A protein has these predicted regions:
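Acidic, Mg2+-coordinating phosphoryl-transfer loop and its flanking beta/alpha structural elements
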Residues: 161-202
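Substrate-recognition/cap helix-loop segment adjacent to the acidic, metal-dependent catalytic center
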Residues: 30-32, 52-62, 83, 91, ...
Length: 217
């Protein structure tokens, strides 16, 4: 296997976090006096940084965005975080990689303390060698998060791959100088066509396909 380090995005890649994220979004919109989100807007919240979705997609001011993020995190920390569930076969995939000597980590836009709590409650102990996420102010780019994970792992970029479900992941991998595998079972890419235009070495529809692709690279 070419890769000595495999990094996963979290939302829409490691775990289906939609139920908790959707509930937190609706709570935050209600608390800030906005109309409920429709299905398309809810889906857009899974993966990207919260500052992006509230400002660019909801049209909020900076002050409104700050209040919305506070409300989102209030609900998410109490309830939404624990509504998540790993995708079928994900724990088994990770453990098989670990048995082959691969170092496994997470690089997510989710706040790092939330990511650690979620993964610690949903995956067996020892699955992840590093968990890197966003800072509380949501100022880190995906590339910076990826690079922080690589640095902590002591990995070489040429032997590292990021797996994710959105163009944010693809762009972050490219900016960080690592390979990228797109997945179509999350909330971003829905098919191979969606991943066109972004550097990637493969497109996978489930965990079995991820494992098979990594084995032949």
């Amino acid at each position: 296997m070419k890769y000595k380090a495999v990094l996963f995005d979290l939302d829409g890649t490691l775990c289906d976090t939609t139920e908790g994220v959707y509930a937190a979004v609706q709570y935050s919109l209600e608390k800030t006096g906005h109309s409920p989100a429709d299905d398309a807007l809810l889906k857009a919240f899974v993966g990207p940084p919260l500052t992006y979705t509230y400002t660019k997609l909801c049209g909020m001011t900076e002050e409104e965005t700050e209040r919305a993020i506070i409300a989102f995190r209030e609900f998410y920390a109490d309830k939404g975080l624990y509504m998540s569930k790993p995708y079928e076969g994900m724990a088994e995939l990770i453990m098989s990689l670990k048995k082959k000597g691969v170092r496994v980590g997470t690089a997510t836009y989710k706040r790092e303390d939330f990511a650690k709590s979620l993964l610690g409650s949903k995956f067996p102990e020892g699955c992840f060698d590093v968990i890197k996420g966003s800072d509380s102010a949501c100022t880190l780019t995906k590339a910076q998060i990826v690079e922080a994970a690589i640095s902590e792992l002591g990995a070489d970029k040429s032997e590292t791959v990021l797996i994710g479900d959105t163009h944010f992941d693809a762009e972050g991998a490219a900016a960080a100088g690592v390979d990228f595998i797109a997945v179509t079972y999350g909330c971003g890419f829905e098919n191979e066509h969606d991943a066109e235009g972004y550097p990637h070495i493969g497109v996978c529809g489930n965990t079995r396909e991820i494992g098979a692709l990594l084995d032949i690279l």
